[in-house]
């Protein structure tokens, strides 16, 4: 068994917490956790700790929440921990070079894409949105550039026609931790050699924007169907009907044509809407103040609200 390493873990969301769980169950010692400051959340806007902080507190691990790692005080605090390795997963702060150089074995990152494709903040959703046939996790040695470091290990998984941003996230959150543990063992043994990324093959996964979730029915149906899956469970695609907001939780390709946004048909199978190319059948919707429902349930009680000829998005 490889030597036990003194590890500092840096991460924030649930995806990162799954990696921390695996490290806590390993032979390695997690000596400290870095995570984003508590943020207001929910209707009451109470300050809420990140999933990573909650897990660290449960296990009695010291938690650090600097607003930045660019100041000398935060850097000195990290150096005093004398870590062998820093494992970074969806942390959300830039690590300056002095921080990258602090651990004996440097810093490694678990990134939810097959690099160099989809560098950046939202690789899972962008892969679904683009219609990619596979995704995965890349463990890389970190350097100053954004997701540009040498690749230590890759694991892949197919993306199905039913995958959502949420389902792919959950699958990668299971694959990533095992890849990180394998990479750590290789680093500790000195047997792992990084592979340089081909920058010419790189593209960028921009952060999700709520404005992108508004359905533009002038676009092709195939693009909108992928967008709806990619943006589920957040931020959820939406449109309007008769002035009311309408969240779209699921859809499939339909048949027919017409002016974009026009309802072509409504029945127990779904609400078929004309797009710039083709048509989209909306199968799971949420009305204001309601919960997500299969369209067949809405149709039974609100048939007149979804009459063919009405236009969505006006």
From Swiss-Prot:
GO cellular component, one term: cytosol
Catalysis: reaction(s): L-methionyl-tRNA(fMet) + (6R)-10-formyltetrahydrofolate = N-formyl-L-methionyl-tRNA(fMet) + (6S)-5,6,7,8-tetrahydrofolate + H(+)
Annotated EC: 2.1.2.9
Keyword Transferase: yes
Key words of the record: Protein biosynthesis, Transferase
Record has Transmembrane as a keyword: no
Binding site for (6S)-5,6,7,8-tetrahydrofolate: 113-116
Enzyme class: transferase
GO molecular function: methionyl-tRNA formyltransferase activity
Annotated InterPro entries: Fmt, Formyl_trans_C, Formyl_trans_C_sf, Formyl_transf_N, Formyl_transf_N_sf, Formyl_transferase-like_C_sf, GART_AS, Met-tRNA-FMT_C
Family: Belongs to the Fmt family.
PANTHER family: METHIONYL-TRNA FORMYLTRANSFERASE, METHIONYL-TRNA FORMYLTRANSFERASE, MITOCHONDRIAL
Protein name: Methionyl-tRNA formyltransferase
Lineage, highest ranks first: Bacteria, Pseudomonadati, Pseudomonadota, Gammaproteobacteria, Pseudomonadales
